C-alpha cells in the first residue's frame, strides 16, 4: 500500500515517444502518487468544510439562523478555491494530467486485461471531460452574499463533490491497474480538527 503522507517524491517527468510497459507503469505510479497528494488535500478540505457546516454551524442556532457576512465569505471562499484547484487538476495540458495518463493507458492493452474494459475506460474519460467542461464553462466566482448561501452554492458544491469523488476513484483504480497495489486516499487527522472551535475566540472584556 502506498501512503501519500510519506516524504515528498523528487523526480522529473519526461514523456518519451513510447515506453515499454514497465517504464510506463513506473512513470504512471509516480504521477498518480503526485496527483493523489493534490486530490487528498482537496478531499481533506472538503471534509473539514462539511464538518464545519454539520457539527459547528448547524448544531448552533446562533450560527445557523444568522446571515453572518463572515460565514458567507467562508462558504464562497471554499467553493471558489475548490473550483480553481479542480480546474487545474482537470486541465489536459497540465504538467500532471490524469486525463492524459488515462488516454495513454489505452496504448498498453495488456494492462487492462481482466481489470478494465475499453468501454469502462472510455466512460471514465467521458466523465472527466464532462466535469472539466462544467468547471470551465459553468462555474463563476461568487461575490455577493445572496450568491454565497448554502442553497445558492448547493448545485455547484454537488458538482465539485462529483469531481473530487471521480478523481479519487480514478486514481485508486488506475494505480491498481499499473501497480497491482493500493493507494491510500482516505482523509485522516492527527488530532481533532474541530478543537479550534471548542474555546472562545474572543475573550470577554
What are these regions (language model features)?
Residues 125-153:
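Histidine-centered, metal-coordinating catalytic motifs and their short helical/loop contexts
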Residues 2-131, 157-205:
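Amphipathic alpha-helical interface segments
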Amino acid at each position: 500500500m502506498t501512503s501519500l503522507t510519506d516524504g515528498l517524491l523528487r523526480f522529473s517527468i519526461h514523456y518519451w515517444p513510447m515506453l515499454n510497459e514497465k517504464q510506463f507503469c513506473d512513470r504512471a505510479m509516480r504521477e498518480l502518487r503526485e496527483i493523489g497528494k493534490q486530490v487528498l488535500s482537496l478531499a481533506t478540505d472538503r471534509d473539514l468544510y462539511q464538518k464545519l457546516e454539520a457539527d459547528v454551524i448547524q448544531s448552533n442556532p446562533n450560527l445557523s439562523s444568522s446571515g453572518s457576512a463572515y460565514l458567507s465569505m467562508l462558504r464562497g471562499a471554499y467553493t471558489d478555491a475548490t473550483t480553481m484547484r479542480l480546474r487545474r487538476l482537470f486541465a489536459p495540458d497540465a504538467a500532471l494530467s490524469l486525463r492524459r495518463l488515462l488516454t495513454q493507458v489505452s496504448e498498453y492493452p495488456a494492462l487492462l486485461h481482466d481489470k478494465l474494459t475499453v468501454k469502462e475506460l472510455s466512460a471514465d474519460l467521458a466523465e472527466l471531460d464532462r466535469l472539466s467542461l462544467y468547471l470551465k464553462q459553468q462555474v463563476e466566482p461568487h461575490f455577493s452574499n445572496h450568491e454565497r448561501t448554502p442553497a445558492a452554492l448547493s448545485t455547484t458544491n454537488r458538482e465539485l463533490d462529483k469531481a473530487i469523488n471521480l478523481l479519487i476513484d480514478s486514481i485508486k483504480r488506475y494505480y491498481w491497474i499499473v501497480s497491482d497495489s493500493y493507494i491510500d486516499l482516505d482523509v485522516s487527522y492527527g488530532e481533532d480538527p474541530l478543537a479550534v472551535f471548542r474555546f472562545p475566540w474572543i475573550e470577554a472584556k
